[in-house]
Amino acid sequence: MCIGPAPTPETEEELPPSPQHVLTEKDHQRLRFQRNIGVSAHIDSGKTTLTERILYYTGRISQIHEVRGRDAVGAKMDSMDLEREKGITIQSAATFCDWETTDVATGNKQNYAINIIDTPGHVDFTIEVERALRVLDGAILVLCAVAGVQSQTTTVDRQMRRYGVPRISFINKMDRPGANPWRIVNQIRSKLRIPAAAVQVPIGIEDEFKGVVDLVHWRSIYNEGQKGNEVVISQEIPESVMELAKAKRNELVEQLAEVDEEIGELFLNDELPNNDQIAAAIRRSTIALKFSPVFLGSAIKNTAVQPMLDGVCAYLPNPAESEVLAHDTSLPSSAPQVQLTPAADAPLVGLAFKLEEGRFGQLTYMRVYQGTLKKGNQIYNARTGKKVKVPRLVRMHSNEMEDIESIGPGEICAIFGVECSSGDTFTDGSTSFSMTNMYVPEPVISLSIKPKGIETPNFSRALNRFQKEDPTFKVHIDHESKETIISGMGELHLEIYVERMRREYNTDCVTGKPRVAFRETITQRADFAYTHKKQTGGAGQYAKVVGYIEPMEPDPETGKDVAFESVVMGGNIPTNFIPAIEKGFYEALEKGALSGNAIFGCRFVLKDGAFHAVDSSELAFRLATIGAFREAFKMAKGVILEPIMNVEVVAPVEFQSQVIGGLNTRRGTIVDSEVRDDEFTAAAEVALNDMFGYSNQLRGSTQGKGEFSMEYKHHMPVLPNLQKDLEEAYRRTLVVKK
C-alpha cells in the first residue's frame, strides 16, 4: 500500500476510479483536530522516555516512570516484563491522548486527539516499525544530540519514505555532555537527504540547558515545576542567544525558500515573511514530504517536550490530508488504485495492523480508513471472505483499555474476538477493497529449537501465536533432521521469542547453534524442453514443458523476486494443468542443487508443451516442471548468496585501530567512519556468516566500552572458496543419506 502522495493525475480521465465520497463539514471538523503519529528512532535515543513525557503532559498518566524499571515500575509504554527488564521496546504499543494548544495570534485554546504508537528502535524488530508507519499519518523522528544519525535512524528513514510518512525531527538529550544540535541538523540534511532546519534554538546547552527560543513565533519557552509541568512563555529573547537565534531564523527561511513556492517568491523579492507565513510554509512542505522541522529538548530533564507537541498539531497532517490508496480486487491487478476518503458515512475499510494475545483472547489493532466501525457490526475479512461480528471495541492505552461503542475513520482502535492475520483488510461487504500487504523482509538467521523434557501443547501453541503476531518470525520442520527450525531477523529477535516462551508459556527450550540463511540464485537465462514419461502398466505419466528461466530483480514495492509466467498459446497444455506447473516451479525453488538452500531471484516462463489424453495428470506436469527446472538450473550458472549486514560500531577513540582491525579480519568493508570528541563510529558491510561471536571480541578489544548494531542490507554471492566448501558439505550430506 502506498500511504503518501500519489502522482497527481494530469487530466480528469486519469483519475483513479474512486467512489468519490465527499467529506462533509462535520467530517472536516472531526478530522481537523486528530493526529495519528508514531515515535521512531535508533535504539537508546530516548524514544520511550519521550513518549512517557507526552503521556504525562497530556494527562494520560499521573506519574512518570523511567525505562529499565529503576523505580520497579518501568515505562508505561513498555508493558511486557521482558521490555522493562531489558530497557528496550519490543512491541509498538498504541495509546490515545488529548493535547490542548493555544493559538499564538488569537490566544484561543484548541483540543487535539492524538493516537501515539511507540515503536521499537532495535533493528531485529523492524517489522513492528513497518507496521506502525503503515497506519500513521505522521511521525516524530527522535535523534540523540550526541550520537545523531545512526544505523537504525537511516532504516527508519527508509521505511518512512516507503510509506510516505511526513516527519518532524526531535533532537533529544540536549542536556548530555557533547550535545551539538547543529551537527545533527547537518546530518539530517546530508545522511537522510531531506531539507531540514531547526525551528528552535537552545537556551544554554549540556547541563546549562534551560529552555528554547521559538524561531517561528519569536519567543522564549521555559519549563518550570518539579516535572516541567508549567510552560513559561516570555517575549524576551536572552541576549546570550540573540545573534544565534537571528542567524538560525534566517537559515530556516532560506531552507523553506528552496522547498516552498510562496516563501521562495518573498525571498526573491527581498521581502521577509511574517510568523504566520513561516508556520504555514512549514506545514505545507512537511506534509508534502519536502521538509522536516527540527525541535530540540531533553525528555529526561522534562524540558521543551510541550512545544514539540504543539509542533505535532501545527505541522503534521490530519487523516484527511494524508492520501491512502487501496486495491479494488474486483478489477484487474493492473487497474489504478482507488483513493479512500475518511468520510463517516462511506463504506467501511479498515486494516488490522497488529495482533496480540490478550487476557480475553486475540486482540486486533485496527486503523479505520473509511466509514464507521460499530460494536456489534458484521464485518468481512477481504482475504478470507469470512464474515465476523465485532463483539467488543476498545481504545488502547498501552495494555489498559477503555470500551467504546463506535469509532470513526482516521482513528485507531482494538477489537476482541476477531480471528485474522496481521495485514488483513476488513470491509462492510459492500466494496471489494484491499490494502495491499506490508513489505515483509525475509529472515536472515535460523536455529533449531526443542523443549527441555517432554513436548507439551504449549510449545506448538506458542510457536503458532508468535507466527501470527510477527510475519518475520518463521517456523518449519527440517525434513532430514526432523528438528523444529525457527528463523528471524537476528539473534536478539529469536532470543526474545525463546525467552517469551519460557515466561508466557512455561516452556524451557534448548536451542542449537545459529545458522545463516544462505540462498541460491541464477546469473543467466537457460532454456528447457523437458519430457516426463513413466510407464508402469495401466495409466502412465506423461508431460512435456518448454520454456526458459531467467534472473529477476526484486520488485521495489513488494520485494518479490520470484515469478511464474505462462505464455502458452493454443491448446498444447490444457489450462487446468497450468496451476500444477506453477506449483511444481515453487516446489523446485525450495531446495537448490548447490547447497540445498532456497532459490530466489528467478522468473520461470512457460512457452509451450505437450500432453497425452490418458497419461497426463497434474502430478505428471508437476514432476515435469521440477525436472525441467533442475536441468535448466545447471546451465543458468547458479551461485550461492549470503546475507550482508550493515554493521555500526561506536567505541572510545583510543580503540579505533583495534575496532577497524577487528572488522577487517572479518572481511568487512569499511564504508564510513566519523570521529567525535572522545568516541568514534565506524560503519561497515560484513557477511553475517563472519559476525558470529563479534560481541565478545568487541567487548574484549574495547574493555567493554564498545557497542555495535547490525541490520540486514542484501544478499551477495559468496567467495568462490566458500561456495566450494558449501557445495562439498551439501554433497556429503546427500551421500550420507543414500
From Swiss-Prot:
Example GO CC term: the record gives: mitochondrion
Single GO MF descriptor: GTPase activity
Q: Name one Pfam family in it.
A: EFG_IV
Q: Where in the cell is it found?
A: Mitochondrion
Top-rank taxon, per record: Eukaryota
Matching SUPFAM superfamilies: EF-G C-terminal domain-like (SSF54980), P-loop containing nucleoside triphosphate hydrolases (SSF52540), Ribosomal protein S5 domain 2-like (SSF54211), Translation proteins (SSF50447)
One GO BP annotation here?
mitochondrial translational elongation
| Disordered: annotated segments | 1-20
Main location (coarse class): mitochondrion
The UniProt annotation places GTP binding at: 41-48, 118-122, 172-175
The tr-type G domain covers which part of the protein?
32-320
| InterPro entries documented for this protein | EFG_II, EFG_III, EFG_III/V, EFG_IV, EFG_V-like, EFTu-like_2, G_TR_CS, P-loop_NTPase
Which PROSITE patterns does this one have? G_TR_1, G_TR_2
Q: Which UniProt keywords are present, listed alphabetically? A: Elongation factor, GTP-binding, Mitochondrion, Nucleotide-binding, Protein biosynthesis
Q: Its pathway? A: Protein biosynthesis; polypeptide chain elongation
PANTHER family in the cross-refs = ELONGATION FACTOR G, MITOCHONDRIAL
* Other comment: This protein may be expected to contain an N-terminal transit peptide but none has been predicted.
Q: What does this protein do?
A: Mitochondrial GTPase that catalyzes the GTP-dependent ribosomal translocation step during translation elongation. During this step, the ribosome changes from the pre-translocational (PRE) to the post-translocational (POST) state as the newly formed A-site-bound peptidyl-tRNA and P-site-bound deacylated tRNA move to the P and E sites, respectively. Catalyzes the coordinated movement of the two tRNA molecules, the mRNA and conformational changes in the ribosome.
The UniProt entry's sequence similarity note says: Belongs to the TRAFAC class translation factor GTPase superfamily. Classic translation factor GTPase family. EF-G/EF-2 subfamily.
* UniProt protein name: Elongation factor G, mitochondrial
Q: What is the lineage of its organism?
A: Eukaryota, Fungi, Dikarya, Basidiomycota, Agaricomycotina
